[in-house]
């Protein structure tokens, strides 16, 4: 153990040593520690002493000889440099010191300053030789007599002179002014160039001088000081100007032995290199080692002789010593390498490409040129390229090939690239070949040579090219883009010797605009232009590029490739494409398929899912069409036209201001559907020997394809369906043509006449001669505008002109229906065409008898009127006769007659015979009828006259119940009948009572099923029968037919209709409902089931009819369902419907006053809320207008009435609310305050108002508020309380200063403007007198006095013990602190009267204006002190005031929430300690569409939430007293989050934008980069140094700003607890967030104890925090108490996007320095609570129950025995942490059992168990036995527990005295024997879950200010267990 401890101690020493050393390196610094300055002169000399890594305060010793001027940075709070200047004339050498004190660390740096006179000066330079046209900077430096250099000469004046050295007039140097030179002083950080330039501009020179070489030669430069009496001090130098020389090839030059080459000499003239013609008279050449190389002295021709190194020198003879040299290295070669580089067709090397050596594979592109270079390198390791000369033997083979050609370089380029070692390769065609290069050289002796050889393989490839389907062959791709839609497109590429897709590499120039995959699939990212480059993996120079432009779609058009109309029941195809702003179509846009919404303007055209129809896509691709972006298939359900619309709408922000904020593209197309073209017979043949058709039936139900006509007759036909005329721009066709015809001319046998006068689609077809033909009717639209494809429909009609082959009679039918004709023609007949079977008809009536012609094919004729008919009656004398009068009235045709039947029964024969041609047609058609046709053209029928028997109803659905009965009624026939059922197990016939045998029959159900009841009338011959179908069934369903949501006004009743039936949809008659045991089930007592006769209470009563009534009792929403009992015993349930009970609607406010131009959002209080809409109207729109949202605009003075009408889902009016509005111009204004008096040091808000209204009526229209106070010694305005820029200047806050009265005045102007209707401006002035009440002369108790309201019981304010809970008296459970009220014993009445009393830990008050003090006595130590005093006062004022709302202005983000605390004050402005529930308050706003306000359960807070951008004024008032009001202006919009943060140096902070309507893009800026740096794009900031600055965000039309404060170091650290945080089963002490302090001046007080701190939670709606200290360990915490699920459900503003977990932060800040803060983030996972009992008792009468959950509804629920219980979810409002769910529990078995339902939340592991007991009412003997055993166990357990407690108490009694004594006598700091002190509070009653911060502040202040109070460790506690 000892070695381990020693190692640990040694490690700590090392760490501390390292820390100390790091501190020595870091810290503040200055540039100089010793400075030499001249004395005060005519021109002062300044020196800047620069500091770094600190913020300095400057001081110096001798203020008489030195001046120090600090310089501040941009923040004006920190000095990092100072200017030093001597201010005393010279009187000998002087010394002083300057001190730089770092205000952050306190470190002091000393700088010694010497002041002395000049002894000499000297010109300093970098070189005495400068180039021709070159610059040189000369500087003067001064020295004292000890040769110490002066630190600065800036500011002194000098005289500079230039003079030729030879004394001539030609100068070789010229002066360059400083302002024209390229010199800089780094913005003043590295020089004083600005001062030196000013000196030159004034005509003198500074210590800095710049010259330029103008001519070759020598020049004298002199300088002397222009400062009396030191003008004799001077200096002089000589500078040489020479011409700059350079040699090519560049040095060093490596050559082979025997090589010969010449140098090129270049000189700089005018900063341009120029070659010198050799030989030159001014230049001579030489070599240092002539054994290695030799050189020509005139022209510089050099030859390498032997291996070695030497130098060639060229000298300019005009300037002595001006030479230039080049190193020559004669070497042997080591390697020969070939290089290939791309070569442009223009003859230039492509410089950006890197040459490829022969060590790599060479790939070249067919059709391109390449430069091949042969290079030689010397030996390794330092290989150098050898300069190839004309004498070197180097060769290249393989010039001729099928794949390439090699040519020499042009002469003009041979000097640059080398004629000997460079060639140009022209690639011709793809293929593979080789090149060979050799070098022959001397190996070291002139006699022997060696050869280097290299062979290189070359592959020629095709050029890499994109394959684009571009019309203009421009390599450009256009792709669309919108946010979250990334269009993709595959690019096709060829060439590059590629064999697979992996042989290409893809690149994009801007990945933020366009991305590309490894397979060539590009994806659009944002708008812009990017270049996609594809490169062959074998050759990086073989590539192709395509420009891809990504743009936002500008328009959308329909593709004109499909028909726009089609026949009903088929599909129309449609497709759209999009275009860019320039009209170009996109290359691909199918990614928008899902975003483009298709819709039609009619329900007859249905959009079906056609995205997977590949045939349509293939069809589009095969067409010459633009690429489709979206496709649709439209099913045509019915006829008509509509507009097909494709819409692409999306809201977003762009990346620059030139782009709009949304996209809304539409493309429309008119489409239509028509019925199939058909021919319908329009003329009726019913009276003319033809068939009948119903003109009234639907046109699509009746068409004709064949017509049979007798010559001489006609028929009218009508065209139905087909396309209608499209429009005037589309040609419409409607024709008739012959498909085929007989030999004769068509016009001679048929006539088709278009009846234009009657109807456009009517044709008359008349038959002229015998024969057959077919007609084709064509109708439709051809090509035209918006009609790209013709749509022509056709219909065929066959016409037969012939004679009937037979006739048939139709008896007792109103018309000649085709089915009746067909049945009659197919009936059996006897000779003479007499129908065998008689036709039975009822007697006593007139019946119609008609004849119809039948063709040889059995088809009925359409018209046979050309033929005449003869009618005959046989054996009908007493039975029937022709009613001629009726015939003449009803018909004029001979093909139908009317027969009158007598009331007799029997047989009667009717015959009709064709007798010839009608007389009107005989002349033309007399020869058509053949001889002997009468025998065949006849028909006869026998009539059986009887009475008809009928049974009603013919179908009956019967409920299966023994008590059910079915009555059947019979009519007609005789009274002799028999009834038979075909299934006796379903029903039986019961004979009716006497007297009803002939009219009724009764059935009784016997079993489930269907049966047919047949009734035979045996009284007629032949017997007649009638049928009835009976179905016996059990009820399958019951339904509430009145709707799923019902709204009822409170106090009224509502009738609900029911339906019952079976699965096939048939319903029972209401007479059977009484047998179904129908019950009404209501969730709660909001509504009650009442009887129909009276409104008596009858909940659960049976329903015996098809409707029942409910009465609305209380407000709210409940559910209701009904049940019916089946015969099997089971129950069927209806759907559950919602029933809402609403109060009568009221318009809020019901009466309002506004000024012209003001607005106010009205709302409806009460009224229904389910599926309703509200319509607002005003009677007089000239006075006020109102929008649909309820926003009322005052326009001009007057009065009007406002109606708010509430409509249901079907448009019916449900109810109405009425209000009134007055618009006027107030004549005067007044100033309003909540009280006329205010105490000294206290505050009170004041605001203007009008007699007719308040601030809500006019504040938006007024401005220029000017506040004044007559006597500011009495009253003052609080600084910065008026913020006119925030439009809150209408509210001001005054504070009392001294006793007295004074007048407060306000003046303001208002512009009452209603655009186009009213305009007037007025100025108002108002004032009031306020009194300031002074403090009492001696009011030491005022700070420790609690203000409470009268007749009030406080929360537990009085702690009962100073000991922790576990050390209290375990027997009595009483604390050791006793409280009592101090009373005046001299007055017995006052003594006995308890005006203020103590109840436990609470204080109770009675009347107002009472004051009492509370005495506290410690029973342990006997100490007595005054704990506090209580004053009782009336609540007189109200405020919305907190630290976050200091000046009545709030900035709130959209969607953001904020809690507004409600505080109460007395008449003097003194706040109440508590006033829970004493009075009511109202919170109102003029714009409820901007801000949502919610108050919860009379809590002293109002919660607001930003709804949309805008401003709203919030007013809080005591009751309806508007004088007792306070105002807060809320501005809702986008904000920077977090607002006004405080961070520490080195920390990071992410800024973001909250509350914006859409996604915001822009840039971030900081006003001071030295304090904080911020990322321009992301908004991430880093604190650099201490200070304050502003962070600004600039976006599209948006500029936001917030202040940032940076503190030095982290002073407060907050950590998160490691456990899972939830709001269920919260620890009693809450969740602990450890808070740690850094020991600096912010965190330590003068007494050494930790300073107090505050805790806050954000967002505040999830819980509350309070600070706490563990007195034993000294650890400090923020205790977090989350609100329960029940509290969150009732207090939170519910939104749909809430989650079951909430991220929050806990912030801790010092009370003395709130900027010093820290925070920690954590995640709260919501739990759940079960509302209701923890045990469910269910019985057979109610075998279902409901389980309700609140909170986190992501639970799992199950029971142990699934065969007994079923659990189903019936309702779930998933609002995250504040959700609500209901589960329905059904009993499946009718047997007694117990079970347990287990509800589990997987996220937290929370488990809740609910016991279930199902009692059938059977014998409880067995359970009683079990109950006795359980009771015995409980009694035994209680007995054991009592004994254990007694023993434990005895043990504690023996140990308490020792512990108590030790605790009472020990008064030092906490040691091992000190008990653990964790709590000093017993909470008797808690009105609010939040710790009252005023109470904490007050107790601290009371304890600190109490005289003679001993601040011992035991006594210094906070009653709320807080710091």
Curated annotation (Swiss-Prot):
Signal peptide start and end residues: 1-22
Chief location bin: nucleus
Annotated membrane topology: Single-pass membrane protein
Residues carrying sugar: 73, 117, 289, 609, 863, 903, 967, 982, 1171, 1199, 1550, 1568, 1743
Residues of the BIG2 domain: 1152-1205
Membrane-spanning residues: 1829-1849
Location(s), subcellular: Nucleus envelope; Nucleus membrane; Nucleus, Nuclear pore complex
Pfam families cross-referenced by the UniProt entry: Ig_GP210_15th, Ig_GP210_16th, Ig_NUP210_1st, Ig_NUP210_2nd, Ig_NUP210_7th
Recorded GO CC terms: endoplasmic reticulum; nuclear envelope; nuclear membrane; nuclear pore
Keywords, ordered alphabetically: Glycoprotein, Membrane, mRNA transport, Nuclear pore complex, Nucleus, Protein transport, Signal, Translocation, Transmembrane, Transmembrane helix, Transport
Keyword 4Fe-4S: no
GO biological process, one term: mRNA transport
SUPFAM superfamilies: Invasin/intimin cell-adhesion fragments
The protein's assembly and partners: Part of the nuclear pore complex (NPC). The NPC has an eight-fold symmetrical structure comprising a central transport channel and two rings, the cytoplasmic and nuclear rings, to which eight filaments are attached. The cytoplasmic filaments have loose ends, while the nuclear filaments are joined in a distal ring, forming a nuclear basket. NPCs are highly dynamic in configuration and composition, and can be devided in 3 subcomplexes, the NUP62 subcomplex, the NUP107-160 subcomplex and the NUP93 subcomplex, containing approximately 30 different nucleoporin proteins.
Family to which this protein belongs: Belongs to the NUP210 family.
Name under which the protein is recorded: Nuclear pore complex protein GP210
